[in-house]
Regions:
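Conserved active-site-proximal phosphate/metal-binding subdomains
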Residues: 4-155
């Protein structure tokens, strides 16, 4: 995780990786099916906005803090019923919120009733681009960094 730009790629390669996986950077592409509001949350975020939260099943997740997460912390989002039974280990009577509703609302852009999961570097997203532009940018950044280090880029 945490691979966003050429420095991150170079760091992973210096550790012996043959390749990297990039995810967060593609959320703010035109082709991503997340709502414009969801994408804008990434663009508007700062490093300090990103936090680790607990899911109703006890697993940690990284998310961009906002109204919904604040209300969860205040105990205001506890579900009164469970219409979905989507996760066997989820006990809605003890859950701080309904994860399926939070994720659905976030995907639709209703971030007062959901939140944006993200990678550690989501705050580095600055604009909406195309997948093509993002890939070309990564390739050119990486190739330039390899040349500076006297290495051959294999793309």
């Amino acid at each position: 995780g945490g691979v966003f730009d050429r420095e991150d790629v170079m760091h992973q390669m210096s550790l012996g990786a043959d390749g990297v996986q990039v995810a967060t950077r593609f959320v703010t592409t035109e082709e991503c099916d997340a709502s414009p509001t969801f994408k804008q949350t990434y663009i508007d975020s700062s490093k300090d906005d990103i936090e680790i939260i607990a899911s109703p099943v006890g697993m940690p997740g990284r998310a961009i803090g906002g109204e919904f997460i604040r209300r969860v912390k205040e105990g205001l989002m506890r579900p009164k019923k469970c219409p979905f039974h989507c996760i066997k280990t989820c006990d809605y009577t003890k859950s701080p919120y309904c994860i399926i509703m939070a994720l659905y609302n976030a995907a639709k852009g209703n971030l007062s009733r959901g939140y944006a999961f993200c990678g550690a570097n989501a705050y580095m997203s600055k604009k909406i681009t195309s997948v093509r532009e993002t890939i070309e940018s990564l390739k050119s950044e990486f190739a330039a960094a390899c040349r500076r280090n006297g290495q051959t880029a294999v793309l």
